[in-house]
């Protein structure tokens, strides 16, 4: 049995364990909001309006568990998500049509907006990924789609396939009033009572939110029109992203982990024990395992990673 859903030598590990994921995660939520029907599902059937921070942390927990959680842990989380989604429906005010939250097209959009954002942000931030590794990341993430009720063939499994999908769905995307409000929430989120310990860090969030907005595709920023466009913005955003990544990478793991909820931290601690038992050197933390020269994989680990 694999110690983690994704092996440390996987492309998934290289992307998801990078600290640029904070920007990638917020970018993903901003991109997802441009699908008018999907946005109505979030607006009507979630607590996003009162707890956008919680939504981000739940997404981080899902990414964590489906990366370094045990296969059994990820299966349990996926089953829970599918049960919740199966019970939820909403009405599109533009058409009056009722929709289920777990409709295939909506699930595909959410998946693609997430993993495309994760990959594109990682590459832009300077994560060293070859074109083959980028394709492998999307192929690996097609397996993750099963946790929300999709099959691997429902979603793009290469960069070329992802580009074709995003081009095909682009005409249906637009910034509704709800989407613009969602982006403003993400730029300056409220801190709910159960996360009050993070309140002192709120002023530090705006640069992260603004950078997440800045690394959206240009067409998406034009749709929103929430922040002004400036000359040289693309190059400046890339430079700022790389600077932020370097700063976050310098934060010791014990302090960095304070921003995650208890369940996510507990999952990481359990993963550390399983990896140690499997022969991985984890004394320098999970991030050290991303470098192929800094971990010792047990016999057969590469075969398991391909399975």
Language model region names:
Residues 1-307:
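Mature, function-bearing regions of proteins
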């Amino acid at each position: 049995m694999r110690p983690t859903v994704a092996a440390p030598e996987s492309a998934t590990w290289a992307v998801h364990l990078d600290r640029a994921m904070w920007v990638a995660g917020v970018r993903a939520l901003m991109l997802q909001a441009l699908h008018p029907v999907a946005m109505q599902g979030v607006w009507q059937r979630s607590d996003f309006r009162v707890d956008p921070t919680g939504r981000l942390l739940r997404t981080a927990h899902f990414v964590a568990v489906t990366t370094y959680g045990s296969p059994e842990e990820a299966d349990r989380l996926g089953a829970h998500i599918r049960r919740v989604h199966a019970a939820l429906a909403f009405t599109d005010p533009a058409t009056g049509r009722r929709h289920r939250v777990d409709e295939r097209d909506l699930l595909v959009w959410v998946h693609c907006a997430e993993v495309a954002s994760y990959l594109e942000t990682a590459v832009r931030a300077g994560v060293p990924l070859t074109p083959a590794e980028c394709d492998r990341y999307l192929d690996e993430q097609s397996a993750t789609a099963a946790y929300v009720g999709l099959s691997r063939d429902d979603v793009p499994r290469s960069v070329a396939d992802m580009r074709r999908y995003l081009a095909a769905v682009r005409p249906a995307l637009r910034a509704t009033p709800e989407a613009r409000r969602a982006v403003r929430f993400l730029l300056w989120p409220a801190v709910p009572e159960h996360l009050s310990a993070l309140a002192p860090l709120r002023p530090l969030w705006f640069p992260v939110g603004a950078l997440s907005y800045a690394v959206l595709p240009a067409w998406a920023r034009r749709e929103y029109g929430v922040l002004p466009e400036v000359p040289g913005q693309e190059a400046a955003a890339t430079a700022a992203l790389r600077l932020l990544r370097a700063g976050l990478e310098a934060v010791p793991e014990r302090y960095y982990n304070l921003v995650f909820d208890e369940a996510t931290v507990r999952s990481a601690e359990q993963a550390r024990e399983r990896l140690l038992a499997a022969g991985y050197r984890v004394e320098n933390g999970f991030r050290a395992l991303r470098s192929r020269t800094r971990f010792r994989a047990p016999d057969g680990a590469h075969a398991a990673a391909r399975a």
